Structure formats: C-alpha cells, structure tokens
Amino acid sequence: MRLLLIFSFLTSLVCAETGYNGKSILLTLPSPSGILSTHDLNISVLAHPTDKNRGIAILPIDYYASTGDSNITWIAPGKSISILLIIKMVSYPLETLSVDPAKVTPPPEALERIERERSQAKAIYEHFTPIRYWDRAFIKPLDSNITSEYGSARTYNGTLQSYHGGVDLRARTPIPVHATNEGIVILAEDRYFSGGTIIIDHGEGLYSCYFHLSRYEVKVGDYVHQGDTIALSGDTGRITGPHLHFGFMVHGVQTDPLDLIEKINTLFIPQKEDFVSAITH
C-alpha cells in the first residue's frame, strides 16, 4: 500500500500502516530530507520525482519477515513522524518443478563459482548510488503473460529449495527484453543458476534483474533508457523452459517487482491533498 503523509503546523504525527512480506511500502513525506529508520534499516529520504517540496522513501519488507508490529520513524529538522508498521503474511503458492539435477545438487566443482556469484551479487545490491537515473514511470520488460508469480515456495525435483524472488514472463522463443527504466548496466554475464543475467542500477538503491537470457545487447557500463532492448530472452540457467525472470532489489532486499513498480508509478499521478492528514491508499 502507498502511504501519503501531508504535514503542516505539527512537529509530530503518529499513524499506522499495514505491510506484507515480500512487498514494499512507498512513503510520500512532507519534505525531501531526513532519514527513515526501522529496526534494521536507515533509509535516506529521496526527492519526489514530480514535487520538489516532498520526499519519498521505499521500504522493502523481507520475504521472511515475522508478523507483528514495529515502529518506523521519519526524522528531519524540526519535524518527525512515527508510523506503526503492522506486518502481515501473504499466503504464497507452492510450485513443484523438475530441472537439471545439477542445478539442484551442484557438483563440487561448481560450488566455488556459486559462492563467488552470490558474494558478487550481495555486494552489488548493497551498494547505494546517490544518483537517480529515472524520471518517469517504470515498464514491464516484456509485454507478455506472467507464468509464475513472485513469492511462490519452490520445490525442485522433490526438494524444497527457495522461494521465487521475481516474476516469470512468457517468452517461448527468443524475443527482445527491454529496460524497465533508465540506469547503468552493472552486470551482464552468464551465472550458474540465473543463466544469462543483466542487472541495471537505477540509482538510490534500486536494481532491476533479468535472468535466463540467450544474448546480450548491452555491456557493463552502458547507460540504458526506458524501453531499450538490452537482451534476448532464453532458456539458460536453472529453468523448466524458456522464459524471462524479472526481479527487483531495493536497499539490498528482494521485493515483488510488479508490486514495486505499480507503487512507484503512482508518484506520476497528480495528487490534490491540501490539508494535514495521513491517508492510506
């Protein structure tokens, strides 16, 4: 859900918001400054893309977050807002998949590569680029149907391995994959589980991910625009068939990509609130 906080005259405001594991909360704040603090994250408030007098903060809720209440505090010079965050669980589905056994129980010679790739990805996602490259709404990288939703618990060859950290989009034959928005290509290489992989840094803690690609149309360091063709879809890595896996990382936390871009895109819809309020959309 998107929480819009309009603040005037008061120096403190208390409200509540409900969030869900694996989803993000988008906060629109009364000033483009300050810090949003949770029990495990300190998030810089960012400039609103269409209103210079407001700020935004994107709070990802970890897939494995526990249910219950926690406090979020926004602090800026002379102002503060306390938000009671109520975390609820999403009932994600279970998927049973059959894949190459080597992608479930990797051979010993692959383990070093897998660990190296995980460490590299962690370092990428935890890096905060203090620049925003995008100034418009985000788009899906393919105009096709979803074949596997975000968050499903996945059993590979009878063994529960993980949850699905993105969405799968239908791509029966190699077709062009488009950048969801502007940014810098940070990674473009083959990886053990995700196959042909591209990661784009959109700035300010946002990274989009594209997996199982068959061909790259960009290289590391390239600046891409929304809609640019960055690759062709494929069937590389741990897959059951050809498709595109699309994911998003926010401040180092994996989040539902379509939920995230839907919420960010509301920032480009004019708002007309002109009173002191806390409104939940």
What is each stretch, according to the model?
Residues 1-7:
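Sec-dependent signal peptide recognition
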Residues 11-13:
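N-terminal signal peptide c-region/cleavage motif recognized by signal peptidases
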Residues 15-93:
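Cationic-aromatic interfacial patches
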Residues 176-186, 218-233:
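Short, well-structured beta-strand-loop connectors
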Residues 84-194:
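Surface-exposed, glycine-biased beta-strand/turn segments
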Residues 191, 230-238:
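Short, charged beta-turn/beta-strand-edge "cap" motif at the junction between a beta-strand
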Residues 180-217, 242-244:
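Zn2+-dependent peptidoglycan hydrolase active-site motif and core
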Residues 92-120, 134, 219-226, 247-281:
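Acidic, glycine-rich catalytic/binding loops that coordinate metals and/or anionic ligands
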